[in-house]
Regions:
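A structural "domain/chain start" motif
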Residues: 2-7, 20-65, 169-171
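Sec-dependent signal peptide recognition
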Residues: 7-15
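Short secondary-structure boundary/capping segments
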Residues: 32-33, 72, 119
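Soluble non-cytosolic domains of exported or imported proteins
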Residues: 46-54, 100-104, 141-157
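Short acidic low-complexity segments
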Residues: 65-76
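Surface-exposed short loop/turn segments
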Residues: 75-126, 133-148
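C-terminal/domain-edge helix-coil "capping" segments
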Residues: 115-117, 138-171
Length: 171
């Protein structure tokens, strides 16, 4: 009798905890619930980076968005337009021979949602990310390989930030 009371109490407390997490808007990390009007989009990217465009398409598809070509879109299909990505560097550290050893790189861009007739509905909104690049005084091939992998991660972060921000679009 006593054992079943303890088990019942534990299950009851666990159920209360689960319901309270759900009630407060708890979502799994990376899960995005986009408005239904944004589930079908056309994409116009002037980012200047194929790596970002690829990361953005992957992030949109993971969020449940179907991306149409503009020729297949109708008047109810919105267009996601991404402007050119800008990059800025700040030197953070130098070695004894005055060579840069650490750089903070910041990537930013603006995007907006347009109707089929070109009128903007949401935006322009800024997205940005920054990261510290170390080992800039290494050999050229090592630094290039490191920087390439870091840039790829930054583009993925930027795309994830854009998709996450779309979650709050009042459409």
């Amino acid at each position: 009798m006593k054992a079943t009371f303890i088990h019942t109490t534990r299950y009851f407390l666990f159920a209360i905890l689960a319901m309270s997490l759900t009630a407060c808007g708890f979502h799994l990390r990376g899960q995005v619930d986009l408005p239904s009007s944004l589930k079908t989009l056309t994409l116009t990217s002037e980012s200047g980076s194929d790596e970002f465009d690829r990361a953005l398409r992957i992030a949109l598809v993971k969020a449940g968005v179907v991306i149409f070509e503009e020729s297949n879109a109708n008047e109810n299909t919105f267009n996601l337009k991404v402007n050119k990505i800008t990059s800025s560097d700040i030197d953070l550290a130098y070695d004894s021979s005055n060579d840069v050893t650490q750089v903070q790189r910041r990537l930013s861009s603006y995007y907006f949602i347009r109707q089929a007739d070109g009128k903007s509905l949401y935006g322009s909104r800024q997205i940005s990310t920054s990261r510290v690049f170390e080992n800039q005084d290494s050999s050229a091939s090592t630094a290039l390989s490191y920087n390439t992998s870091q840039m790829k991660a930054m583009y993925t972060d930027l795309a994830a930030q854009l998709v996450s921000d779309l979650n709050y679009a009042p459409l």
